[in-house]
């Protein structure tokens, strides 16, 4: 609370000694003649305490009014010039953003404003004080909620997704406090409307009641709602050049100054909803809980710092125990045919054919696949720091790129055109030529090469967007993350419907 007080300390206003006379002049209601700042402050404190549980940011709101002697800025400066009416109008159109207008209390604000404009509506001084306090609190709370929703999204993706590692800015006290110093409501509200062309396109589709081919109108609407929320999150690339993978689209683009300079198919991790049994139309309360499969590719952002040409595959223990050891138990020559070496306590075992994999503990051995045509990572992998130990890589399993559903990997991203990606990462020149040559060698040695300048990489999850022709694209919710997001949105909107009832 002390920290919040510092936010408002330098902006503290003087108490309005002419409060009663000013309100009487503007309302023609004699009740206001006896209103004083001191009398208002006493009631205001009580109303704030009563409504604390009904407000999203009670500490921030309380800190402002405490620092400003409970000065009713919205009532005094914004009711009688029509500003608050404008605000309520914007709130009432929140459905155009896929949001519930009830969150922003437009009806309550209009009802309170109407009482101030009707000289007989407010009957006594206590009612006047309470209505001033309620209108101040309601307007402040709704402006903060509306501003946060449009600029940052309603939900924090980090709180709803277990595998979300993308830097995402969330609202802070300094930003939220801006609403107390608005001079022109319409100008402020216009300034916070999302202006991204993708957002405007999906917003128009929602307003027009668009129905996607093969999808019901209800499901289409929910597609639009969840992807509008994603577009409001402040997690978008800020660099001029970056690589971006969209998991549901199974594609990678390299963007440079807003244009795609390379586009390719990719394969991503196997997902929980590849059979499409979960949908946005048919879900229940438990669907809001994110239960990712072990193989799902995470959402993240990082920097590609190096490549390994002709890599050695250090096979993860989960894959080794569930797949490699099972196959080796069936066929003693499986490991040698796949160029896989076996290690125990860091020491290479020379005759793995003699080992009893069927009865060995799952974590007894380590497995490494040597470079070559059969290596699961192909001829090159692109490395970037991340908590999930995933990377981009080549693959010998090219047939998967001919399929429409390409959520087939163990979690890493397989590239349809690794050579083209290497060329974009390094540019034409001796380094790329060296890499390209090494990828064709018959008996290669693994080589690590640093990426000069590094390349930002974003792995995202977008199921609905507008393509370059203006056509809205829809993709199946392969990981069920739309269902999770929609479930949380519904719960949040329902809880805030109760908060709105001041």
Which residues are covered by each model-predicted region?
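Cationic-aromatic interfacial patches
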Residues: 12-163
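C-terminal motif of bacterial Sec signal peptides marking the signal peptidase cleavage site
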Residues: 7-10
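Well-ordered beta-sheet/strand-loop patches within structured domains
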Residues: 12-60, 66, 144-145, 161-171, ...
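Sec-dependent N-terminal signal peptides
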Residues: 1-4
């Amino acid at each position: 609370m002390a920290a919040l007080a510092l936010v408002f300390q330098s902006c503290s206003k003087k108490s309005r000694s002419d409060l009663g006379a000013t309100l009487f002049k503007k309302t023609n209601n004699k009740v206001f003649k006896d209103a004083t700042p001191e009398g208002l402050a006493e009631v205001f404190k009580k109303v704030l305490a009563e409504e604390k549980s009904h407000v999203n940011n009670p500490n921030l709101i309380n800190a402002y009014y405490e620092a400003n002697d409970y000065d009713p800025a919205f009532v005094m400066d914004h009711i009688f010039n029509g500003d608050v009416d404008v605000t309520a109008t914007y709130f009432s159109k929140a459905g155009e953003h896929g949001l519930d207008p009830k969150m922003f209390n437009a009806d309550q604000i209009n009802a309170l404003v109407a009482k101030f404009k009707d000289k007989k509506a407010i009957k006594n001084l206590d009612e006047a004080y309470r209505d001033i306090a309620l209108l101040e609190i309601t307007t402040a709370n709704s402006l903060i909620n509306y501003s946060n929703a449009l600029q940052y999204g309603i939900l924090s993706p980090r709180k709803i997704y277990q595998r979300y590692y993308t830097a995402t800015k969330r609202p802070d006290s300094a930003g939220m406090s801006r609403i107390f110093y608005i001079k022109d409501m319409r100008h402020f509200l216009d300034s916070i409307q999302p202006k991204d062309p993708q957002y405007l396109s999906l917003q128009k589709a929602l307003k027009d009641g668009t129905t996607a081919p093969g999808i019901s109108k209800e499901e289409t609407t929910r597609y639009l709602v969840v992807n509008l929320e994603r577009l409001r999150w402040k997690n978008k690339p800020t660099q001029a050049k970056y690589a971006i993978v969209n998991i549901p689209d199974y594609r990678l683009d390299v963007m440079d100054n807003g244009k795609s300079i390379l586009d390719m198919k990719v394969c991503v991790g196997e997902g929980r909803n590849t059979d499409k049994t979960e949908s946005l139309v048919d879900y229940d309360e438990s669907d809001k809980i994110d239960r990712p499969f072990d193989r799902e590719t995470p959402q993240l952002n990082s920097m590609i710092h190096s490549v390994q040409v002709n890599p050695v595959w250090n096979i993860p223990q989960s894959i080794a125990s569930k797949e490699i050891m099972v196959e080796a138990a069936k066929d003693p020559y499986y490991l040698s045919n796949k160029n896989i070496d076996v290690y125990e306590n860091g020491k290479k075992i020379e005759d793995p054919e003699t080992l009893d994999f069927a009865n060995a503990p799952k974590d007894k051995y380590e497995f490494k696949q040597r470079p070559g045509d059969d290596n699961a990572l192909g001829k090159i992998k692109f490395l970037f720091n991340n908590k999930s130990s995933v990377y981009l890589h080549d693959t010998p399993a090219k047939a998967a790129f001919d399929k429409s559903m390409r959520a087939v990997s163990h979690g890493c991203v397989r590239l349809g055109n690794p050579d083209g990606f290497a060329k974009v990462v390094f540019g034409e020149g001796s380094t790329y030529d060296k890499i390209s040559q090494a990828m064709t060698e018959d008996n290669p040695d693994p080589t690590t090469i640093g990426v000069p300048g590094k390349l930002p990489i974003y792995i995202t999850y977008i199921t609905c967007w507008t393509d370059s022709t203006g056509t809205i694209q829809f993709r199946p919710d392969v990981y069920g993350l739309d269902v999770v997001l929609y479930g949380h949105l519904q719960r949040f909107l329902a809880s805030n419907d109760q908060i709105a009832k001041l």
